Amino acid sequence: MEKFRVHGPFTLSGTVDISGAKNAALPILFAAVLATEPVTLTNVPDLKDVDTTFKILRKLGVVVERDESGAVQIDASKIDHYVAPYELVKTMRASIWALAPLVARFHEGQVSLPGGCTIGARPVDMHISGLEKMGALIELDEGYVKATSNGRLHGARIYMDKVSVGATLSVMMAATLAEGTTTIENAAREPEIVDTALFLNAMGAKISGAGTDTITIEGVERLTGCQHRIVADRIETGTFLVAAAVSGGKITCRGTKADTLEAVIEKLREAGMEVTVTEDTITLDSKGQRPKAVNIRTMPHPGFPTDMQAQFTLLNVVAEGTSRITETIFENRFMHIPELNRMGAKGEIEGNTAICHGVEKLKSAEVMATDLRASISLVLAGCIASGETIVDRIYHIDRGYEHIEDKLRGIGAKIERFSTKFEE
């Protein structure tokens, strides 16, 4: 089991090059299954979940190659297998995105019920119901979701009972090759959906309205090859901005877009931080000041992102004042608070709300990561705590942060990865 050892405290300052967004790269990689010709993707992050996606695609018969520059070539022209198996899918819930492209292009597909972070219920029902409305026949058999269709799927009006990024992406992918027009109402509006639509349109799809709550897709008979650059990771950007805020530092995030992170930037300014933006950079200068407590309520985009909640929990436990953080997207997403409390934080959980009473300093401790975003908040807590902090179960962090210890060392952190052979 790998762990991080962090020797704090220190100020985090410098420049960070932001990686491509995992939450765009994964659906785009699966969407490449729709194309009859090779596609080339750049700015694809080097992450465990991306590697898992490569393995799933190869199981389907897709040729996947990453060259020395980091560009990824995908050739799905000779797919000969239509099952995404349990041994790969169990580690990553995003695997459900394999289903829609398979049934849209080949009229059959099977995906094991997915795994991933354990942060509450993440049902695949909305993915399934969307495909059913487009004419797919769905069976649940021995832990697999099986989808078949008698010829091409057909266009449909699909209203999302709940705003869902995953289901919006599934329906949008399937609709590109459907006969007729599909309308998705109450669609998710995240930047990663916009990026996936740009990729699909580059292959010849006819999608309009991505980034609004109504997306219209006019089906085409086939999709062809293209080149596409994955959008910058807004969550990684926000994470490094928080790193500067909690450590009294100044960090510039390079190769990113402020318009994908407006709610986070607004809250950082409310916390007393100076944030300046250019076309492709965001800089946070704390001026050595302790942040002020800010209330947070997670919401679908363009609201405050749930994937920044854990980082702002850390900000609030070291801020001046008391704050309330309400989580409306996922259940069970405050598992980092007991771990932060081991480091001297004063956090309480009341249902879907956390109450944070700010303290001036944290102290080192041994803590355990419970999910992807919780893990980075604990690593950053170690950066500002006095002494040596050990963060266990860091495999979570490798799922979503590219070369994280190298990037942290580049802005002043003392962090090392080490392995333990035995677990009690």
Swiss-Prot record:
Q: What class of enzyme is it?
A: transferase
The main location is: cytoplasm
The reaction(s) annotated as catalysed by this protein in its Swiss-Prot or TrEMBL entry are: phosphoenolpyruvate + UDP-N-acetyl-alpha-D-glucosamine = UDP-N-acetyl-3-O-(1-carboxyvinyl)-alpha-D-glucosamine + phosphate
A molecular function (GO) held by this record is: UDP-N-acetylglucosamine 1-carboxyvinyltransferase activity
- UniProt entry keywords in alphabetical sequence: Cell cycle, Cell division, Cell shape, Cell wall biogenesis/degradation, Cytoplasm, Peptidoglycan synthesis, Pyruvate, Transferase
Q: State its location(s).
A: Cytoplasm
Enzyme Commission number(s) of this protein: 2.5.1.7
The residues that hold UDP-N-acetyl-alpha-D-glucosamine are R93, K162, V163, S164, V165, D307, I329
Put simply, this protein is called UDP-N-acetylglucosamine 1-carboxyvinyltransferase
Q: From what organism does this protein derive?
A: Actinobacillus pleuropneumoniae serotype 5b (strain L20)
Show the taxonomic lineage: Bacteria, Pseudomonadati, Pseudomonadota, Gammaproteobacteria, Pasteurellales
Gene that encodes it: murA
